[in-house]
Amino acid sequence: MSYTTATADSDDGMHSSIHNESPAPDSISNGCRSRGKRSVLKKGPWTSTEDGILIDYVKKHGEGNWNAVQKHTSLARCGKSCRLRWANHLRPNLKKGAFSQEEEQLIVEMHAKMGNKWAQMAEHLPGRTDNEIKNYWNTRIKRRQRAGLPLYPPEIYVDDLHWSEEYTKSNIIRVDRRRRHQDFLQLGNSKDNVLFDDLNFAASLLPAASDLSDLVACNMLGTGASSSRYESYMPPILPSPKQIWESGSRFPMCSSNIKHEFQSPEHFQNTAVQKNPRSCSISPCDVDHHPYENQHSSHMMMVPDSHTVTYGMHPTSKPLFGAVKLELPSFQYSETSAFDQWKTTPSPPHSDLLDSVDAYIQSPPPSQVEESDCFSSCDTGLLDMLLHEAKIKTSAKHSLLMSSPQKSFSSTTCTTNVTQNVPRGSENLIKSGEYEDSQKYLGRSEITSPSQLSAGGFSSAFAGNVVKTEELDQVWEPKRVDITRPDVLLASSWLDQGCYGIVSDTSSMSDALALLGGDDIGNSYVTVGSSSGQAPRGVGSYGWTNMPPVWSL
């Protein structure tokens, strides 16, 4: 009995096997049966006689309708077996042999894109069957694995890698969208209330209102309390940490009780800013707001010798040392106020300190001042403030040199009110300049109250005054500053030293304050006798300790 290599047809496809050429005894009984004749169909390898019958049938009827072969011929084969035999072995355009280099390259490229789609690959390779392509690929995998070579060439691997990444990203995005949609549906269908624990955690980091007030006071005094924990939660209305003092050595005697003198954060958040559109308010130490002060300035808070500004305040370009005369500044005025009657009077070049005080604090703005002149660059940097300071000082010195000998009474007193109440005999004294030489500043002599001036005692009030002279080279620094008092810069501890020609008598400052406040404030004062054995220095002498409630804490 001889054995040959043949191709057997099966439902799984075509495969090679070694079998006996003669049919098995039970092949007919176990074979396929035809529907009409109930004949048993033959299985197993094809014979040359069966191949000839199939070739003749295809030449006459063409390809297709493989189930009709059994009807028109004596071939006892099913339609599937006839189709596979013709496609894999008997068709005339079938290519036999090994694959060419071009065919191998095309198979590798198509497998990188399609995968194990053998039938689709066979359509692009005419004359090659899907079974041949599959056998070639499996053989290639085993051969390259043994040699340790990559399955795909480098150029094909890079292209396939990009394609795989894009495909993976698209799948990840699709899966992520599905998960979000499912989470959203679960969140919408849930009956439990949603608790925002993160908000509670953030609220725990925020300090309380009392802590914030302490924090603001300490930050503005430069005590180093601006920790990084509170900086990110600081309200936008409060001054930023960059505007805080660099060190706390300027007022080393300030204690923790300063927090009572500053407004709480609730005041800054709830109080509306009521500002005159043409006013640029500034105050040396405006920590408490009195009814009289609220008429001329908006709610503000500013510490001297600092550039910290709140509620649109504009800092002074030059720190003020020594005694500052309590008077409405040049930047603080209204259109309908009585200060429009003031006339700008330049101060003599006594010193740089007095020039800065007269220019920024004492001299009221002229009537032709525009809104742009009132320090219009409110939100600009420090350069504009320095230029503004230089401009004012230059104009003051220039007007001093070009002015006539006839000058006003003083830069801190109301010239209009004084000249109206002065008798005719005293006008010559003022015009001659004799009185001005002895009454240049508050630090050189004493001033009487407006009631005495109106009574006609102008000449007699200043008859016994003695001009007090001080050396200008004297250097003095305050030993103690009580910043909790609104009259800290006018207290006797500052004035008793007599530095820079500042008046050493507090009665003169009270008189100037009475002249500034008008009749309403001046009439509310009560004359207090001197406790010492010396005679009273003037009719309008008052004590700071017995001031009315409007000025005391």
From Swiss-Prot:
Protein name per Swiss-Prot or TrEMBL: Transcription factor MYB65
Native organism: Arabidopsis thaliana (Mouse-ear cress)
DNA-binding residues (ranges): 66-90, 118-141
Residues covered by region (Disordered): 1-44
Gene Ontology terms: biological process: anther development; anther wall tapetum morphogenesis; gibberellic acid mediated signaling pathway; negative regulation of cell population proliferation; negative regulation of growth; pollen sperm cell differentiation; positive regulation of DNA-templated transcription; positive regulation of programmed cell death
InterPro entries membership: GAMYB-like, Homeodomain-like_sf, Myb_dom, SANT/Myb
One Pfam family hit: Myb_DNA-binding
Disruption phenotype: Reduced expression levels of aleurone-related genes (e.g. CP1, CP, GASA1, BXL1 and BXL2) in seeds. The triple mutant myb33 myb65 myb101 has a male sterility and exhibits slower protein storage vacuoles (PSVs) vacuolation rate in aleurone layers upon seed germination. The myb33 myb65 double mutant is defective in anther development, with a tapetum undergoing hypertrophy at the pollen mother cell stage, resulting in premeiotic abortion of pollen development and male sterility. This sterility is conditional, fertility being increased both under higher light or lower temperature conditions.
Name of encoding gene: MYB65
Subcellular location: Nucleus
